[in-house]
Amino acid sequence: MLFQDLSFPAAIGAVFGAVAISVAARCIYDLFFHPLRNFPGPKRAAIWSFYEFYYDVIRDGTYLWEIEKMHQKYGPIVRINSRSLHIHDPEYFNTIYAGSGRKVNKELSAVSGYTFPHSTISTLDHDLHRKRRAIVSPYFSKRAIAEIEPVIHERLNVLISRLAEAKGSIVDLTSAFSAYTADVVTYHFYGTHANYIGSKDFKYGLKDALTVLLNLYNLTRFLPVPANTLKNLPLPILGLINPNFPLVVSAREANKKMVLGYLNKPDEDKKAMKDARSKSVIVSALTDPNVPDAEKTLDRLLDEGETIIFAGIDTTARTLGVALFHLLNNKDVLMKLRKELQAVAKPDGQQWTTTELEAVPYMRGVVQEAIRLAYGLVVRIPRISPHEALRYNGFVIPPGTPVSQSTYLVNNDPSVFPNPQVFDPERWVKAAQDGVSLDKYMVSFSKGSRGCLGINLAYAKLYLGIARVATSLDMELFETTAKAISVYHTRGFAFPKEGDGAVKARVMGLCK
């Protein structure tokens, strides 16, 4: 009855007034009554997530630099939005990203941008995540990855051959490495690959779809419902909204075809596949009687496959690009790497194993430096201690508080890595000789019970890929400077201020 007596303008005014009162009340609560009210940080950042939204959505993934400024002004622990804290302290990283001894949940906003709600990486609850991870983790053990090294070498044979054929031409090494990593990771998950290395100019739809998702990451993190709705719209409508959106759906349909291709096989064929080769994740999971039926649904398999594939493609490809940039940009480093690898050269017809390359100190230094300066996920991935209060620097962090650190800030901390922007494999060699474990501070794969599932596969692709490409081909950088691989925008992964971070080179030919 109250609103019936109001004119339309008055009713609109009443609604806006109610909204204004609600917003004001929320601001007052966040500033003066919230459990985090006494933590350091600018007051504007403590009000909802407006400040974060402005820098990550409006200004395209630049909140990291504001957080860095906060630490410079307020110290190692700061409140970065109404309910979250950020800490910059390499020694405290393992406390936030804890192992199996303490429960850690994920924050909803941290996984909303993935748009794969049924995947392990998007699972919020600690216990459900542990169960889901246990299903697939055996297929990513060092032993399991060692068994697919022949496939990795076969793909590298094709990659090196294609690059050699481009003698005198300019190639996009990042795209080439993306095709290589895509072939390996899809083969491991599905038991087959699409020969992305054979695609023209190393361009393929799956990579384009990933680029679309990354460009949308910051928006979908704040607005997940519209993003998930888009996936279900017809392709023509998606194309009208954005010409690149259909690429995402097409990639999902291609993955769906692979899954259904196995699900629809006769039982005899499934058994033959399992008996012949049970190394692929999907074949192994679907034929494992210990895996609950609820974990074998089409949505689960699609989401799981897509997150493993997308995560396994771009991070490794970018790291390979960073490695080759620095090797080609500093020929002394390249020559030293070749010399050390020549000392452990294999007879004709034989290839290095990952284990053999890991034992070469300088090779290990090159790989670790590439990983450090590629950063992995550069966005904040908060962890929540649901029941236990954390203590840091005199502060008691209430249970249920999202707390995070930045891989970029840790990897560039001069107290751990002097001259952090310098690509210096010797820092790892010297640290090992001095009995210092820099691995403790290698956080590009995150840490703890939710650390990167595919770390062993990533290392295999990196060791074998860097060693073979660096010793097989002579190349020169083409119109690629350090700015091309620098970090300015954080869209899940690191992006430079301009361009897509591609490393380009002119192929001079095979090494003599």
From Swiss-Prot:
Keywords: Heme, Iron, Membrane, Metal-binding, Monooxygenase, Oxidoreductase, Transmembrane, Transmembrane helix. This is Cytochrome P450 monooxygenase astB. The chain crosses the membrane at residues 5-25. Pathway: Secondary metabolite biosynthesis; terpenoid biosynthesis. It comes from Aspergillus terreus (strain NIH 2624 / FGSC A1156). Cytochrome P450 monooxygenase; part of the gene cluster that mediates the biosynthesis of the sesquiterpenoid aspterric acid (AA), an inhibitor of dihydroxy-acid dehydratase (DHAD) effective as an herbicide. AstB catalyzes the second step within the pathway and converts (-)-daucane produced by the terpene cyclase astA into an alpha-epoxy carboxylate intermediate which is further converted into the tricyclic aspterric acid by the cytochrome P450 monooxygenase astC. Disulfide bonds: none annotated. Its EC number is 1.-.-.-. Heme binds at residue 452. The fungal sesquiterpenoid aspterric acid (AA) is a submicromolar inhibitor of dihydroxy-acid dehydratase (DHAD) in plants and is effective as an herbicide in spray applications. It comes from the Eukaryota. SUPFAM superfamilies: Cytochrome P450. One of its GO terms (molecular function) is oxidoreductase activity, acting on paired donors, with incorporation or reduction of molecular oxygen. It is a single-pass membrane protein.
